[in-house]
Amino acid sequence: MWPRLVANKILRKSLGSNNFVADFPPNTDQKLIEASGLADERSKSILHNQHKTTLLNYKVFVSTWNVGGIVPDDGLDMEDLLETHKTPCDIYVLGFQEVVPLRASNVLGSDNNKVSTKWNSLIRDALNKRARPHRDEDLSESKGINGISQDFRCIISKQMVGILITVWVRGDLWPYIRYPSVSCVGCGIMGCLGNKGSVSVRFQLHETTFCFVCSHLASGGRDRDERQRNSDVNEILARSSFPRGSSLDLPKKILDHDRVIFLGDLNYRISLPEEKTRLLVESKKWNILLENDQLRMEIMNGQIFRGWQEGIVKFAPTYKYVPNSDLYYGCITYKKDEKKRAPAWCDRIIWYGNGLKQHEYTRGETKISDHRPVKAIFTTEITVTRRGKKIRNFFFSDRFEERIGDIDSKDYSWIST
């Protein structure tokens, strides 16, 4: 019993903090008054009790990548991960595992924020470099209302030992992001240290709440090791908790949110003999392999993730590679003391509930780690409640509304009072 008590003392420092890194201080102002007609081709409106409810569609990019304790160098090309050559999404959520090696000094010591700073710097440069060359030379075209930059901004970045999640939005969306918060759960050594577990982040965009869970579950390819992974999932869903807010109307638990996505190195393996697994991988028999995929089997048997969804997997297993190569671990020769690890889809992205539609589910090919990154693109519906015209006229002159009408022809904007 005493090791757990010792660990809990450590956790008060290492996991107990709700602090996170962001480009702006959290926006908790509930007095958001709409100033635009939201004349966007993506929106549709419904009249309701003298207010107007608008449904907007946003694109959300989600990725997960176990980087194997590798610190990225300044020249790492993020194009493969972020696909910045494509039309940018509105929101980017990037999850990482093993951003630091999982040795005792990192697990028991304070978090090395230099590593997360390095990753965030690479992400910022990649996202904003893509946007700038395509902007109009007129400064007014590159900024939203009140001069808010269109550059992508980090609204939440949180690291727990080797787990890092970082969330980025277009700069003009920031005024409508409220109540960002984090929740860390350790499931590792002694059942509570942060070498395994999750970092969950939540925020509200307009009237819709989001929760993203970045996790690293128990490893192991032996029979019944999946039971420990199932236990980790249940612990994460049970123990993750967020503040309810001053009005006690904010979601507290993960599944209470409107849009929920679970991503990470879930570590589920393929329940087939190693040699058979390798042969099926070589012949790209994905369907046969997926029939024996532990995550899918556990979901189908009702052991975990009831009501969750995953997109169609059409890519090769993402683990375990020889770093800086296209060869799976063990394909050449074994050392006597090496463990045999068959290929598996360890890295996954799944979601819960309605309001999310997945359009892409792929893997990247960056080779610095023994894992390949996995990424997905969703569209999501966002609810916006517009106040009555009398309220608007109390705050805004006709001249101001006329100017907002001009802005509406290009984009939609809100302001806070």
From Swiss-Prot:
GO BP annotation list: cellular response to salt stress; phosphatidylinositol dephosphorylation; regulation of clathrin-dependent endocytosis; regulation of reactive oxygen species metabolic process
Keywords, in A-Z order: Hydrolase
Tissue: Specifically expressed in roots.
Record note on disruption phenotype: Increased salt sensitivity with reduced production of reactive oxygen species (ROS), reduced Ca(2+) influx, as well as decreased fluid-phase endocytosis.
Molecular functions (GO terms): inositol-polyphosphate 5-phosphatase activity; phosphatidylinositol phosphate 5-phosphatase activity; phosphatidylinositol-3,4,5-trisphosphate 5-phosphatase activity; phosphatidylinositol-4,5-bisphosphate 5-phosphatase activity
SUPFAM superfamilies: DNase I-like
Region: Catalytic 2, residue numbers: 339-354
Region (Catalytic 1): 258-273
Enzymatic class: hydrolase
EC identifiers of the protein: 3.1.3.36, 3.1.3.86
Catalysis performed (reactions): a 1,2-diacyl-sn-glycero-3-phospho-(1D-myo-inositol-4,5-bisphosphate) + H2O = a 1,2-diacyl-sn-glycero-3-phospho-(1D-myo-inositol 4-phosphate) + phosphate; a 1,2-diacyl-sn-glycero-3-phospho-(1D-myo-inositol-3,4,5-trisphosphate) + H2O = a 1,2-diacyl-sn-glycero-3-phospho-(1D-myo-inositol-3,4-bisphosphate) + phosphate
Pfam families: Exo_endo_phos2 (PF22669)
InterPro entries on file: Endo/exonu/phosph_ase_sf, IP5P_plant, IPPc
Family statement drawn from the similarity comment of this UniProt entry: Belongs to the inositol polyphosphate 5-phosphatase family.
Role summary: Has phosphatase activity toward PtdIns(4,5)P2 and at a lower extent toward PtdIns(3,4,5)P3 but not toward Ins(1,4,5)P3. Functions in salt stress response by regulating reactive oxygen species (ROS) production, endocytosis, Ca(2+) influx and stress-responsive genes expression.
Name of this chain's protein: Type IV inositol polyphosphate 5-phosphatase 9
Organism of derivation: Arabidopsis thaliana (Mouse-ear cress)
